Amino acid sequence: MSWIERILGRTSSSSSSSKSKVPEGVWTKCTSCEQVLYSEELKRNMHVCPKCNHHMRFDARTRLLSLLDQDSAQEIAAELEPQDVLKFKDLKKYKDRLTAAQKQTGEKDSFITMYGTLHNMPVVVASFNFEFMGGSMGSVVGAKFVRAAERALADNIPFICFSASGGARMQEALFSLMQMAKTSAILAKMREKGIPFISVLTDPTLGGVSASLAMLGDINIAEPKALIGFAGPRVIEQTVREKLPEGFQRAEFLLEHGAIDMIVQRKDMRDTLARLCAKMTNKPTPFKTAELIVEEA
């Protein structure tokens, strides 16, 4: 071995041994622009890509806790857990799918409901968790939604729901389809009593959820570029055998065609919802914007 080979060999071995392994989960790739992002920075930015502003999917519990005032959250119907009444089995047993989803997410089911305050205004909030079996709606989702709506009715306070779902849970068959009617019925009761219901549609909101509670808000809001519809675009294209328009079923397309009321950036969601709740309950705005302060001055 020559002197240069000895030096190069020593250098390469020392550099490789000095390399430290990067812990798993430190970096995340944006699902839109594919930019590699520091995970902690992404969390601070509420899972919105700082490079392209893509709104990535957001954990349901984190979403609700970041929406409500600090230390004000009280979970509603946390004890409810899905049961395999039909002993359903496809490629896997339903109970095995539930166990796997519960282990992966740390949640009992795909829907979380809470009571708390938003800028000191009492509200009831709920969110689907897409990571739990695609945010599918089963019996527990319907029961939790009704319990949350009943709390809003009892306290005469607004109800805000974030949707992120592939639709009804097929493993519960007709029991899951019944939840469409069940949730729609309690929302009709809320409307009769004049209790505000604000629906926030996030990516994706599809199937039986979009065909029931998600589109029944007194105000329907969407996050940017959220996929919203009944069947997905691929299924529609295969059925009609035509190419769909650019951006079909995205939030911007729906806003342009009058299917939703507004699109709100995630960073602005908390203040926007607070203003809407104040307006809809005939209460003063819970905080002053910079524009209002300038006008008053």
Swiss-Prot record:
SUPFAM superfamilies: ClpP/crotonase. Its main location: cytoplasm. The lineage of its organism: Bacteria, Pseudomonadati, Pseudomonadota, Gammaproteobacteria, Pasteurellales. Its cofactor is Zn(2+). Belongs to the AccD/PCCB family. This is Acetyl-coenzyme A carboxylase carboxyl transferase subunit beta. Binds 1 zinc ion per subunit. It comes from Actinobacillus pleuropneumoniae serotype 3 (strain JL03). Its EC number is 2.1.3.15. Acetyl-CoA carboxylase is a heterohexamer composed of biotin carboxyl carrier protein (AccB), biotin carboxylase (AccC) and two subunits each of ACCase subunit alpha (AccA) and ACCase subunit beta (AccD). Keywords: ATP-binding, Cytoplasm, Fatty acid biosynthesis, Fatty acid metabolism, Lipid biosynthesis, Lipid metabolism, Metal-binding, Nucleotide-binding, Transferase, Zinc, Zinc-finger. It comes from the Bacteria. PROSITE patterns: COA_CT_NTER. The gene is accD. Residues 26-295 form the CoA carboxyltransferase N-terminal domain. It is found in: Cytoplasm. It catalyses: N(6)-carboxybiotinyl-L-lysyl-[protein] + acetyl-CoA = N(6)-biotinyl-L-lysyl-[protein] + malonyl-CoA.
